[in-house]
């Protein structure tokens, strides 16, 4: 997927463990999901790191806090790539 600047965007689901990237957009299907991600600190320009992958969840850090999110939430986080 390319954004208006011609840069490639991908979701957090495609990021391997141990990678830090920058959020370029939150693209959620509903406002509850979007608001939840915002409450975690997921905003455009923020750095986000994938710490590990579990069977159904991804462990991330953002703003020095660690969270476990599912693949639906991860697919709503578009990162540089």
Predicted regions and their residues:
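Short, conserved secondary-structure segments in the cores of folded domains
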Residues: 11, 36-39
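A generic structural motif
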Residues: 16, 27, 52-54
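Short alpha-helix capping/helix-loop boundary micro-motifs
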Residues: 32-36, 53
